[in-house]
Amino acid sequence: MCNQTPLRSMALDSSGKQPEQQQQQQPRASSGNGEARLKLRRTPNEEHEPENYEDLPLDYSPSLFTSLERYLPEQLLNSTRIDKASFMRDLLLRYSPDTERVRVLRHKEYRDKIMSSYQRLHGEIYTLDPSSFFAPSFLGAFSRKSEPNFRSSMVESYPGIFTFEMFKPQFCEMLLAEVEHMEKWVYDSRSTIMRPNTMNNFGVVLDDFGFDSMLQKLVDDFISPIAQVLFPEVCGTSLDSHHGYIVEYGKDRDVDLGFHVDDSEVSLNVCLGKQFSGGELYFRGVRCDKHVNSDSTEKEVYDYSHVPGHAILHRGRHRHGARATTSGHRANLILWCRSSTFREMKNYQRDFSGWCGGCKLDKQRRQRDSINATKEILARKAAEKTLVELASKSCAE
């Protein structure tokens, strides 16, 4: 289960756990045919079109293999799909801790059990179809993948928070119907499913029901290009993994959501409907781990009201929560988008003033202190010079 990091309540508002990052070695693995060990690329090959691994019996998520393929050395890119899968599997098994390996295998068994029993209601929405899913304004932004095009279809309603129309009403209705069908299957089969995170008691992890590849393609083809333009400090390279789920609020569902940060570099939140009141999101500044519980400033206060079919895109470290849904039923698609490169680089950094409000305040404080200290030194030297001049003048007289 993915976690969110709940935060202590903030003075400005009444209203998952960020995992410890392990020190990772530079991966090397045998090609399986006696060749010297090959090293992964440091950055993904964006021009390479990776394979689909859905039909192979793998120990890890097929989308992980698809994402990892972009990092393969040039010597392997033209190998057969089986050879590439074998190389990547060997790599993952070699560098995954035993506990992680066991967790992954158990999760795979859990997903396989669901997939073998669950009968899809709308099979067509499990494959990304941009023309059927997306609003024309969102599709238009991708006629040319440029910053002016992206910004023309989005509103930066607050620094670092972008809102835009994304899904057609018909797609929202079909996805909601599919989720209701999932919940009926869970009830009828007396199954137990994992909830999206540690803070939501209701909702469905879409990846566990077969949406993994569709959502990863959504990240690769649409969210990642946008994020690299809008959030270059955390998405200088591709977003290479995700966690996608549905949350539900209202009667007999969750009521609100506490103050927290997401386990993501960039988060996409799309309201699917239905009729509801309340449920506004409140944001209170971007923070790194060190400053995650620091106070907010008045300039960091921003509230957002959901609109069905419309999305809000923000940094995962942008602290936020959801107020109570006072009537009706609200359902949202949440997509946590992650960058393994950024997470690795973050292990070696101490200053995040490029995006953390707390680090930025600390840096400004240090700069002010340095300027004041320099002024004091200059003033002291000027005073000493004046005293020397007065003493010299006195001696001369």
Curated annotation (Swiss-Prot):
**Cellular component terms per the entry's GO annotation:** nucleoplasm; nucleus
Q: Where is this region: Disordered?
A: 1-56
> Which UniProt keyword terms apply here?
Dioxygenase, Iron, Metal-binding, Nucleus, Oxidoreductase, Vitamin C
**Name this protein carries in UniProt:** 2-oxoglutarate and iron-dependent oxygenase domain-containing protein ICU11
- Give the classification, highest ranks: Eukaryota, Viridiplantae, Streptophyta, Embryophyta, Tracheophyta
State which gene encodes it.
Answer: ICU11
Query: Broadest EC class?
Result: oxidoreductase
- What's its EC? 1.14.11.-
Extract the InterPro entries matched here. Answer: Oxoglu/Fe-dep_dioxygenase_dom, Pro_4_hyd_alph
Residues bound to Fe cation are 260, 262, 320
Species annotation: Arabidopsis thaliana
Effect of gene knockout: Altered plant morphology, including epinastic (curved downward) cotyledons, hyponastic (curved up) leaves, and reduced palisade mesophyll cell size. Reduced number of leaves at bolting and early flowering. The double mutant seedlings icu11 and cp2 skip the vegetative phase, flower immediately after germination and then die.
SMART domains in the record: P4Hc
